[in-house]
Amino acid sequence: EDASEGIYVHDDCWLREGEEDSKNTFAFRQSRSRETSFTQDYKDLVELLRYEKEHNGYVVWVLGPACSFDVEARRVMGELIAQGYCQALLAGNALATHDLEGGYLGTALGCDIENQKLHFMGHYNHLDTINAINTYGSIPAFIEGEGIHSGIIYNCVKHNVPFVLNGSIRDDGPLPEVYEHTYVGQDT
């Protein structure tokens, strides 16, 4: 439970029972690809999440910014957090920035999160969001002050789910909670 005995990593999680990893053999279309239906994978993931919740598991999500580009993706991930299927979140500055941009301005990367249409001058929206958050001094203060009520980071704050935001060399901002030194963030 405290990871003193190690951390279990299931590296063959998408292989079907009895299916072998064939990464060392040459074959064409022997396994799964983007063109393959993933319905069973989602069912398996739901079953795994339910099991972990029922058995007091500790589910850590590692998300990238693409999870915040669509209103429905933000809603579903937010609901997973709210319903107790996330005990911690690991991400970068970009996920938090664009998710909070979605709650603040209704855009991510300047595109409407409902229809993906570009807003005029929308490419500045993430910078406006970063500046607003920095003016408040923290993500929770920004969420409260601006009345944000949706999204991934909002749900982490509302439900006291810890998150670690690790920086990269390309980050705009970054946000106040971002670990700018990658190794410090990794150690967190």
Question: Predicted regions: what is each one?
Answer:
Residues 1-124, 131-166, 174-188:
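Metallocofactor- and cofactor-centric catalytic cores in central/energy metabolism, strongly enriched
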